[in-house]
Amino acid sequence: MHSEELLAQVAALPALPGVYRYFDSQGLLLYVGKARHLKRRVASYFTKNHGGTRIGHMVCKIARLETTVVRSEAEALLLENNLIKTQNPRFNILFRDDKSYPYLKITGAPASSAGRDAPGQRFPRIAYYRGAVDKQHRYFGPYPSAWAVKESIELLQKVFRLRTCEDTVFANRTRPCLLYQIKRCSGPCVNLIAPEAYAVDVQHAQALLSGQTQELLQAMEARMMAYSGQLAFEQAAEVRNQMQALSRVLHQQSIESAHDKDVDILAVRVQGGRACVNLAMVRGGRHLGDRPYFPTHLEDAALFEQETRDAEEAPATPPRPVEALVLEAFVAQHYMVVAPPPVLVTSTPLDKALLEALSGHLTAAQGGDHAPAAQGGDPPPAASSGGHPLRGTVHITAVHQPREQRRAWLEMAQKNADLQLARLLAQEGSQQARTRALAEALDLPLADLDPLTIECFDISHTAGEATQASCVVFHHHKMQSSEYRRYKIDGITGGDDYAAMRQVLTRRYGKLAEAAHEAGGVDCAARPAAPAQGQARLPDLVLIDGGKGQVGVAREVFTALGLDLTRIVGVEKGEGRKVGLEELVFADGREKASLGKDSAALMLVAQIRDEAHRFAITGMRAARARVRTGGGQLQEIAGVGPKKRARLLQRFGGVRGVASASVEDLITVDGISRALAEEIYRALR
């Protein structure tokens, strides 16, 4: 039953558009929804009999309600998806994307290059880039993959021979590198090309990236004829060779368009309770490839939408297909942080209200001097392949039934969506089979394997230096990278893996065991029931990368903490340390077990063990590098983060070089102001 206070709050809601949020008794966000009539929509949850459905299960958990009144349904739509993206409610469709988009960067501004003193600044370079932007550079993209960026860089190298080397390398060369020998660079490092001629090549490269291919070819032809008229036949031949190279590249592009410069193609497929949105990108008339997205919480959100929409829709209104819900969620969440191109080609019709709301939101957001920063470290969104942030009025159109080239693009995107979804379903089926095989081998409960949680620990160091412990987490049939943890091991003898394992297990489970004991007679040696969402719990299985000795240490820690010893399993390397011959070592006295080389259970154990090893060794290497280069000393200075530290170390070759640099030298590094340079100078001296 819901509290009288909550029901009174529902009864007092206004008949206005807005967004509502449901929370459980633990304060966890369950669901975010929009409504054109808040009172009618929210009341429907509490007046309908949902029975034993998943919606009924969720409604029973509602303990608190929050609402936000907005001016229109369009505003409610945008606010809803912004909250979904940032707060990850349990029952909404969510598109997670841990990877930021890559961009192609051209350093400096061509118009001002002649007035710069530094050689590297007079000859801009092209580079692959992710991260925050610097206004003095130009960014082209976004690209769907690193491969697409690198392919574009190779194209520019073939046609315009622009440099790709770092400024520090460029400034210290005395003879041209191999790229010059294979005609991929014009040799600006040793003045084999004039800054003015190089600037023209940069401008031509920008025109190509912006999709102005025909205009570019015409300009190059006019330039060639001008050289010929001046009897400068060598220069005319160089321009002719550039035109031939560009024509070959354009001819080799199997997919190109003279009309559509910037288009996104969105194909949606739903099958087996999962969905895939395949996003293909066309920038500058070139098809750059595609990128699949897989939403979470699909079934719950679809049921919610279908059952609760009746509160606001006419009875004769047909239900919207799941594909439409998925596409709407993707467009609202994705293009809030990555600016859309002018045209979207979609496999499912898009709601015009969504496009109008999104266009209005982006127009308002881009009205100032600075574009909003995208999430995940992306540069400010670019309106086109030309690299300029959106300015002025933004207008987005969607085409549902395209023709000609657009139709071919959509058919290809749909085929790729089918392939990606089939791959995902096969992969998930295989992973679930592995989870079941391991549960059967270790006599774990088989009723519900989704919440089965496994944590694995590994220790890594270099001859006792920079010791790091890793903990990786597996549940719901996949690795949960957001729950990984690294532990810096201190206060032990260098190289003592047993002491390191004792320390990390105590730190990981000590507070949890203490809290369980204080909860009032909770038996830590028994397997707990599944906890409420977000509540900390002991894993069902603790894997230790090690044999009898490491497992003995884990047994001592768990005994001291009053925890269940049957959870501990060591992964001991087999004879000759050969893969597939590993044996499982148990802390509760059971005999060693060999699962068999081709066992699905062993494949899962090896997968988790290898991930723990990878996570530990990457952390150890980073810690070791900080110790050896003194980077940690730099990072202790207020205002110097990892990126600025890396730039300083790269420019001056190490902390000693930074310490010996003057303030004037320090301010030449990107991102280092005079005030920060003075602070660094004082701190290192």
Swiss-Prot record:
<dbReference type="GO" id="GO:0009381">
    <property type="term" value="F:excinuclease ABC activity"/>
</dbReference>
<keyword id="KW-0228">DNA excision</keyword>
<dbReference type="Pfam" id="PF22920">
    <property type="entry name" value="UvrC_RNaseH"/>
</dbReference>
<comment type="function">
    <text>The UvrABC repair system catalyzes the recognition and processing of DNA lesions. UvrC both incises the 5' and 3' sides of the lesion. The N-terminal half is responsible for the 3' incision and the C-terminal half is responsible for the 5' incision.</text>
</comment>
<keyword id="KW-0234">DNA repair</keyword>
<keyword id="KW-0267">Excision nuclease</keyword>
<dbReference type="GO" id="GO:0009432">
    <property type="term" value="P:SOS response"/>
</dbReference>
<dbReference type="InterPro" id="IPR038476">
    <property type="entry name" value="UvrC_RNase_H_dom_sf"/>
</dbReference>
<dbReference type="Pfam" id="PF08459">
    <property type="entry name" value="UvrC_RNaseH_dom"/>
</dbReference>
<feature type="region of interest" description="Disordered">
    <location>
        <begin position="365"/>
        <end position="391"/>
    </location>
</feature>
<feature type="domain" description="UVR">
    <location>
        <begin position="214"/>
        <end position="249"/>
    </location>
</feature>
<feature type="compositionally biased region" description="Low complexity">
    <location>
        <begin position="365"/>
        <end position="388"/>
    </location>
</feature>
<keyword id="KW-0227">DNA damage</keyword>
<dbReference type="GO" id="GO:0005737">
    <property type="term" value="C:cytoplasm"/>
</dbReference>
<dbReference type="InterPro" id="IPR036876">
    <property type="entry name" value="UVR_dom_sf"/>
</dbReference>
<dbReference type="GO" id="GO:0009380">
    <property type="term" value="C:excinuclease repair complex"/>
</dbReference>
<dbReference type="Pfam" id="PF01541">
    <property type="entry name" value="GIY-YIG"/>
</dbReference>
<dbReference type="GO" id="GO:0003677">
    <property type="term" value="F:DNA binding"/>
</dbReference>
<dbReference type="InterPro" id="IPR035901">
    <property type="entry name" value="GIY-YIG_endonuc_sf"/>
</dbReference>
<dbReference type="Pfam" id="PF14520">
    <property type="entry name" value="HHH_5"/>
</dbReference>
<dbReference type="GO" id="GO:0006289">
    <property type="term" value="P:nucleotide-excision repair"/>
</dbReference>
<dbReference type="InterPro" id="IPR003583">
    <property type="entry name" value="Hlx-hairpin-Hlx_DNA-bd_motif"/>
</dbReference>
<dbReference type="InterPro" id="IPR004791">
    <property type="entry name" value="UvrC"/>
</dbReference>
<dbReference type="InterPro" id="IPR001943">
    <property type="entry name" value="UVR_dom"/>
</dbReference>
<feature type="domain" description="GIY-YIG">
    <location>
        <begin position="15"/>
        <end position="93"/>
    </location>
</feature>
<dbReference type="InterPro" id="IPR047296">
    <property type="entry name" value="GIY-YIG_UvrC_Cho"/>
</dbReference>
<keyword id="KW-0963">Cytoplasm</keyword>
<dbReference type="InterPro" id="IPR010994">
    <property type="entry name" value="RuvA_2-like"/>
</dbReference>
<dbReference type="InterPro" id="IPR000305">
    <property type="entry name" value="GIY-YIG_endonuc"/>
</dbReference>
<comment type="similarity">
    <text>Belongs to the UvrC family.</text>
</comment>
<dbReference type="InterPro" id="IPR050066">
    <property type="entry name" value="UvrABC_protein_C"/>
</dbReference>
<dbReference type="InterPro" id="IPR001162">
    <property type="entry name" value="UvrC_RNase_H_dom"/>
</dbReference>
<comment type="subunit">
    <text>Interacts with UvrB in an incision complex.</text>
</comment>
<keyword id="KW-0742">SOS response</keyword>
<protein>
    <recommendedName>
        <fullName>UvrABC system protein C</fullName>
    </recommendedName>
</protein>
